[in-house]
Amino acid sequence: MDGIINAKYQDVAEWVPSDGALPAGTVVVLNRLKTNAVAPSAIAYDTAVAGVVSDQPGVLLGVAGDNKAKIATTGRVKVHVDARTHAVNIGDLLVTSDLPGTAMLSEPLDLGGVKIHRPGTIIGKALEPLPSGQGEILVLLSLQ
């Protein structure tokens, strides 16, 4: 392939084996019991974070099949977010929460006056605010 791809939607996703149907916006982690598969996240700050279930990816890789989900790993995608404890503002870093399939604000660690976010846990940056409660916001995915 050569040239520019013009896509209506804004993320890149791949068909990945999963445990049944997963709703769009669900944060997923590597399935620790199955090779090359994902499952909804359920642990806060999980370093096995793998992406977010996409509704309509701009670019979709792989082959569809039973028990597969479209997992976005880059681009902009709607994500289930929990802001019951801390408000989420534009630009905030998001991580997995203990609420299944849901992201939350990343609270940095203070290491001798230097604040750092836990490596390997970041899902992406909030592109929309969520002042309180639970909801779905647009996130710029940048797994790290």
For the regions a language model picked out, list residue spans one by one.
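Extracellular receptor-binding modules and their adjoining Ser/Thr/Gly/Asp/Asn-rich linkers
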Residues: 1-144
